């Protein structure tokens, strides 16, 4: 996966807030960084939680992903380092600017691969690029899907979890048909699991029956340290390195990389 040895680009998505999407972007990114992979998180969520959760606060006059999507700035020019090893962020703007950009994208008769073009210009600089999508399936998310090699769906262990997957699958089908042949949901990650509680085990069983080995073996538990880490502006790997949450994301990173080695630099 990835083109010509360039980064693997993964869109992290589900049409619902609070399912562990941004938590996964931050902590999977940090875990990949620990393994030596140079990793970029592109913050496409208007709330900007991936940026703030890693201590990245772009000044009001600094270019952000909004300017990249408007084709006013190169992606490589907006990237900020984080305190995490090998982990960088392309920050979201504050305020309503991304919502305004999405309105501009909606006005286009045919979706343009704005984010894909920006990523393709610098993807050889990275091992992984994680796209933290908005909790809606609008044009920002479609732009992310057009840029992605694959999609990682975060699935909370709760009732109606699979309903959100059906909506996501339909949008992926539409993008695949019209814009990006070959796009698929390549990975499913169970989040906020309460272990042996009946609801968690039922959702996990249903997901594994439906999607087989596309579901990560590792499951992200409900873990207070995971909830605390964003307020500390760091990953759970840095905030509580030996916690269950940190161990789970390290396991996911190892599954995802699957023996792949970081590029020599």
Task: Label each region the model flagged.
Residues 1-265:
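P-loop NTP-binding core
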